[in-house]
Amino acid sequence: MYVEDTIAAISTAAGEGGVGIVRVSGPDAPSIARRVFRRGSNGDFESHRFYYGSVVDAVTGEAVDEAMAVLMVRPRSYTREDVLEIQCHGGYLVTRRVLELVLAAGARLAEPGEFTRRAFLNGRIDLVQAEAVIDVIRAKTDAALALAQHQRQGRLSQRLDTVMAELRQALALVEAFIDFPEDDIDPAAQDALTVHVRKAAETVGELIAGFDEGRVLREGVAVLIAGKPNVGKSSLLNTLLQEKRAIVTSVPGTTRDIIEEVVNIRGLPLRMIDTAGIRDTEDIVEKEGVRLTLEKIPEADLVLLVIDGSRPLDEDDRMILSALAGKRLILVENKCDLPRAVQIPDELVLMPRVTVSTSRGDGIDELKESIFQTFIHGAAIDSREYVAVSRVRHRDLLSRSTMHLTAFEQGLASGFTLELLAVELRDALAAVGEVTGETTPDDILDVIFDRFCIGK
């Protein structure tokens, strides 16, 4: 339950820095400003104006730090409440001391995400926009940031609003039919009903179809580099990273541990996993590396299967293919700078394949493009118009809405009662409303906002 009290927290990262910010929100923010902040001029704080002065202990009168303070009078603030921000020096101890004085002056310590939760509860943003705030903070690539900013600015919410508008129109028609059962249903009204439902279903379907792309942009993907020893797996990792991260020698079995690094390909964050070469071996340490590799395979979204193009495939290659059965693969034929001796078997002919030379850098751009196109199918992710669902919560609720819309259309065709059809429309509308927060239970809100840091 939302309690209209006053909360406070440090909004900047812990540790040393140039500036530390203590944020206060609630009805007591103006009085707290007067108690803990001393400035040269007298009188009330003017809203949205920065003042220079000192943070003081209200009991002893001691100046704790020189600082800047700004009071933002509601509703023109992040939370739509009175908000005070004190900008002091960024040391760990001084910001903690300023926060303690603010708490002593009447505020309580904010819970994780409570400032953004208040912005949501006070109607400044919807739940999709609130969730986008944490995505902005955690974005690792420009594309992930752009997607998060689009959602924070309300692009996805606008699409969902059009869906709910269509469903409300449809529900209004059905309820009118129910209220006046003695009247024959006008064929034009029934056609309008069908149009409203199909428009809503089409938009929901488009959003669900874009989920996979949205998810990988927000979360990234795990790409495992697999193959037998000495085919160039570590060299491929180094080439993609453009640095010597993994040890490369001519001795088979050099890599015996798992190496993970992040690579950004056109805004797509990749968690690259370099693994030990897979083969039958009696070496105890190498055998442990092979075991770790096999354990990593299930968590990979994509496997780059590296083969040596200068040698024929052998039993080790076939054993690896068997271990990778059912995985999404790109066949990477390395060492194209040497005479080609490999023959691609029929079962691999249709597999995506890129020929590279890690020693010369040949084919690396083509490999990057192939990886990108595996997950992003031509979407203009840098476009101002790009909108995608990126959270499982959103996808599942939209899928539930689709289920009810499908049941509605089937029921309409089968002559179900209007009351039953109205139930399906209400349930479809409620599912979409839960995405934006119109109908979201408090326990779900707790889960969402608990993921935020304190101070946001």
From Swiss-Prot:
Q: Does the keyword DNA repair apply?
A: no
GO CC terms of this entry: cytoplasm; cytosol
Cite the EC number. Answer: 3.6.-.-
Where is Mg(2+) annotated to bind? 234, 255
Q: Where do the annotations place K(+) binding? A: 230, 249, 251, 254
Q: Kind of enzyme, top EC level?
A: hydrolase
Keywords on record: Cytoplasm, GTP-binding, Hydrolase, Magnesium, Metal-binding, Nucleotide-binding, Potassium, tRNA processing
Look up keyword Kinase and say if it applies.
no
Q: Name one GO biological process term.
A: tRNA wobble uridine modification
Q: Which PROSITE patterns match?
A: G_TRME
Q: From the Swiss-Prot or TrEMBL record, state where the protein is found.
A: Cytoplasm
From which domain of life does this come?
A: Bacteria
Q: Which part of the chain is the TrmE-type G domain?
A: 220-376
Please name the HAMAP family in this protein's record.
GTPase_MnmE
What name appears for this protein in its UniProt entry? tRNA modification GTPase MnmE
Query: Native species of this protein?
Result: Geobacter sulfurreducens (strain ATCC 51573 / DSM 12127 / PCA)
